[in-house]
Every structure is written in structure tokens, then in C-alpha cells.
């Protein structure tokens, strides 16, 4: 599958995109990743890198490789286009590249988006695992959906297989569908970040990710709205990501939620989202602090990955 030049510009430009992957129960988790422009139009693939230490993410992708990447944020990037571009597909490869490829290909690409690596005796030791312990994930693109506005407004253009109707049919969780986290607290936290995204599984099994605004919070959950009628009628598991990031990702805020979305059949642009779990990460706006924390996290998670034997999740190079 091949996409046009204007979409390719967006795929090359964004510093941070939202990765949506499925949970075993049929929900969606959304997290930020840096694609560093990895793509191949001739092969119809888009890629991103992550850490071997993030084994839970890799395990879930291995179990169900249907994913989506939402190119939704232009700040600090290389394009001023207003398009919201959603790439949907199936992970075809999870590979730990050799050191030469990491240095020559991934390293050079990373510098364009994330800046030159810190050098010196301390930094070489502290960031050794962070720079070496990278996993390359390749997604075979099945569909691209492009909206003309970053808020998801306007008539969508679909490249590839047609969009299915509705979401994946699901049974409600045994613990009930109502909020398990105080809704007003979630509203306040999500109100501190500029980007808010909602993800759910479509009827064809691929995650859909849409931009949302939050207009209210009460005992039922968060009232979420989209710029167009894209929400599936009924109830299903869904994930929310609220985030912001600074230039070269020298600091970020991430608010992740999983929960239950309920949508009335009469209004496909409004839903009630009941948050069930949350995960918050704040890294101050400082390149030095960000690298210190990244180095610590990479070393810690890599040791955990070795202990858990997560190398089995990787393809052979």
C-alpha cells in the first residue's frame, strides 16, 4: 500500500505519535512513541522504536499485533500541515537491531528529532543501555485515515480497506462499567495537557484513535466529545491518553487511562468515559533531567527484561 506525498510529509515530521495497542480483554492502551520518520512507502510499512524493558507492551503486541499510530501533534516537528493522520495495521516484525544499525541508521535519525546524544565518560556509561537497548517495531499498513484538521474535524479520507461500522462487540467487565477512579480528578489532570486522545477497537479488530475534548465530569464518568461522528454506539473498553512534550522530548507529561466508553446511538460524537485505571508520568522540562531518568529507567527495565527472558519476544536479525 502506497500513500501520497502530503501524508508522507506528516509521517516524516512528527516527533511524538500515539501508539494504540490491544489488551487481552479487548481494550486499548495508548502511549507516546517516537517514530523518527521510520517508514517505507514501497513496502507499505511504518516503524517506531521502543525499549526491550517495556516487556508488557511487547507481549501484548506479540499476542495481538493489530495496532494504530496517530500522527496528531505538529509542535517541535518538521511540518505545519494541519492533517490528523491515523495509520492502522499489523505488526510484522519486532527486531532488536545490531549495534552498527543502531548507530548508523537509528542514531542518525534520532538526532534529527531528539538532538545529538550526550557524550563523555559519565554519559557514555549512564546512557549505554538506553541507546543500545532499542527494539525496532515494523507495522504493515492496512489503512490510513486522514482528517483535514488536527482536532479530527472535516470529512475523513480513507486509503486502503474501507472503515468498518461500529466497534468490537464486548461483554462488560465483571466489576462493572462505572468509574473506579474519581472522574473530576481525571478531568483536572487531563485539563493540564494539550493533547487528549481516545482509543477503542473497531469491528475489524484494528484500534481507532480519535482526538477528544472533555466537557464535564460526574458520577458517571467523563463526558467526551469528538469533532465528527466517529464513536461506536453501545459500550466497549477504551483507552485515553493525555500528554504534552517539549522540544526534543526534553521533558513530558503523560496521563494514561483505561476504562469503559458508553455511546448513545443517537449521537456518535458524544460519549461517557468511565476511567478504571490510571498511570501518570511527569518529567520536568530539562534535557539533563530527562536523560538521567531515561538512563535509570532503561537500565532498570532492561535488567527486569533479562530476568523475565523477554528476548524471546524478538525476531531474529
Label every PLM stretch briefly.
Residues 1-18, 166-197:
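Short, basic/aromatic recognition patches
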Residues 11-23, 67-71, 194-201, 239-241:
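A short, Trp-centered hydrophobic/proline-enriched beta-strand micro-motif
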Amino acid at each position: 500500500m502506497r500513500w501520497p506525498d502530503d501524508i508522507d510529509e506528516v509521517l516524516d515530521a512528527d516527533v511524538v505519535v500515539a501508539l494504540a495497542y490491544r489488551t487481552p480483554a479487548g481494550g486499548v492502551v495508548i502511549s507516546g512513541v517516537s517514530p523518527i520518520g521510520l517508514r517505507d512507502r514501497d513496502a507499505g510499512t511504518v516503524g517506531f522504536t521502543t525499549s526491550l524493558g517495556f516487556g508488557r507492551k511487547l507481549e501484548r503486541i506479540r499476542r495481538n499485533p493489530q495496532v494504530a499510530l496517530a500522527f496528531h501533534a505538529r509542535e517541535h516537528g518538521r511540518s505545519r500541515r494541519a492533517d490528523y493522520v491515523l495509520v492502522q495495521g499489523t505488526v510484522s516484525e519486532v527486531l532488536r537491531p545490531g549495534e552498527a544499525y543502531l548507530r548508523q541508521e537509528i542514531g542518525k535519525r534520532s538526532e534529527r528529532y531528539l538532538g545529538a546524544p550526550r557524550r563523555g565518560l559519565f554519559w557514555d556509561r549512564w546512557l549505554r543501555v538506553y541507546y543500545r537497548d532499542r527494539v525496532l517495531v515494523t507495522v504493515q499498513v492496512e489503512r490510513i485515515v486522514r482528517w483535514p484538521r488536527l482536532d479530527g474535524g472535516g470529512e475523513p479520507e480513507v486509503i486502503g480497506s474501507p472503515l468498518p461500522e461500529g466497534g468490537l462487540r464486548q461483554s462488560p467487565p465483571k466489576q462493572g462499567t462505572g468509574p473506579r477512579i474519581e472522574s473530576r480528578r481525571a478531568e483536572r489532570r487531563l485539563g493540564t495537557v494539550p493533547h487528549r486522545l481516545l482509543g477503542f477497537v473497531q469491528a475489524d479488530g484494528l484500534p481507532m484513535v480519535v482526538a477528544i475534548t472533555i466537557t464535564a465530569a460526574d458520577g458517571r464518568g467523563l463526558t467526551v466529545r469528538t469533532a465528527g461522528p466517529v464513536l461506536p454506539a453501545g459500550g466497549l473498553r477504551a483507552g485515553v491518553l493525555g500528554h504534552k512534550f517539549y522540544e526534543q522530548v526534553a521533558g513530558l507529561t503523560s496521563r494514561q487511562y483505561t476504562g469503559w466508553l458508553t455511546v448513545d446511538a443517537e449521537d456518535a460524537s458524544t460519549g461517557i468515559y468511565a476511567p478504571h485505571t490510571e498511570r501518570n508520568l511527569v518529567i520536568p522540562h530539562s534535557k539533563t533531567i530527562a536523560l538521567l531518568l531515561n538512563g535509570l529507567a532503561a537500565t532498570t527495565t532492561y535488567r527486569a527484561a533479562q530476568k523475565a527472558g523477554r528476548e524471546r519476544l524478538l525476531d531474529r536479525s
